[in-house]
C-alpha cells in the first residue's frame, strides 16, 4: 500500500490519468481481448452498471437518436443496490417501494434452467425468453430501446443459473438486428471466476457490446 501511495497521483479522472490507472486498464484490456480495448474503472458493481447505461445513453444522444431511452432487463435479476440499479433489477418485492419512483427498466423473463413451469424444458424456456424479448422490443418500438442488460451467470436473484448457449446466440442476433446494445453484467462471474477472464469468452459468436 505504501508503494502504491508513492506512485499514485491524485487526478480527477475526467481531466487526467495517472500511471497506476493506465497500467491497470491496459492489463484489463489485454486480458479482455479484441473488442474490449476501452476500460472505465468504478468503485463497485452498482456504479459500474450505471456507467454502462450512461455511456449507452450518451452514444445515442450523440448520434442523433435521443428517442432511445428504454432499458430492458430480466425478471428475476440483480444489478446493484443504488436507486437506479435496484430499478433495473427484477425483484417483485421492490414493487411497492418504487411505484414509479427512480429509474426503472422493462422486464422480460430470465432464461432460467431449473424449476421451470411445466411442461417447459431448458430449451423451450430459452426460446420462450427470446420470444418475450423480441415481443417487448416490438411493443416499445425498436428505435426507442437503449440496451438489454443481463447476467450471463445468474446471481443473487436466480442462484447461479447458466443460460443455454443458444440463448446467448439468440439475444445477440436480436440486439444486433435492432441496433440495441447488449450488456453483460459480469460482476459475479467475470475476471476469471468461471475459468476464462470474461464469461463472455465462452460465447465467441455472441459477444456483448459492453461487459460490466
For every predicted segment, state its role:
Residues 1-212:
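Conserved N-terminal phosphate-binding loop of PLP-dependent enzymes in the Aspartate aminotransferase
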Amino acid at each position: 500500500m505504501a508503494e502504491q501511495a508513492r506512485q499514485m497521483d491524485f487526478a480527477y479522472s475526467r481531466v487526467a490519468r495517472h500511471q497506476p490507472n493506465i497500467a491497470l486498464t491496459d492489463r484489463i484490456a489485454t486480458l479482455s481481448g479484441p473488442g474490449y480495448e476501452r476500460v472505465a474503472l468504478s468503485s463497485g458493481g452498482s456504479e459500474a452498471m450505471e456507467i454502462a447505461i450512461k455511456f449507452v445513453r450518451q452514444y445515442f444522444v450523440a448520434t442523433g437518436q435521443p428517442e432511445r431511452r428504454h432499458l430492458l432487463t430480466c425478471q428475476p435479476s440483480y444489478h446493484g443496490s443504488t436507486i437506479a440499479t435496484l430499478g433495473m433489477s427484477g425483484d417483485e418485492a421492490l414493487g411497492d417501494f418504487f411505484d414509479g419512483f427512480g429509474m426503472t427498466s422493462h422486464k422480460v423473463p430470465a432464461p432460467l434452467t431449473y424449476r421451470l413451469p411445466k411442461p417447459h424444458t431448458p430449451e423451450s424456456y430459452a426460446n420462450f425468453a427470446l420470444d418475450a424479448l423480441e415481443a417487448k422490443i416490438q411493443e416499445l418500438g425498436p428505435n426507442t430501446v437503449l440496451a438489454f442488460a443481463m447476467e450471463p451467470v445468474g446471481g443473487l436473484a436466480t442462484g447461479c443459473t447458466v443460460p443455454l448457449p443458444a440463448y446467448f446466440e439468440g439475444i445477440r442476433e436480436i440486439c444486433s438486428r435492432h441496433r440495441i446494445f447488449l450488456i453483460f453484467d459480469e460482476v459475479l462471474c467475470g475476471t476469471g471466476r468461471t475459468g476464462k477472464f470474461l464469461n463472455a469468452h465462452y460465447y465467441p459468436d455472441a459477444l456483448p457490446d459492453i461487459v460490466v
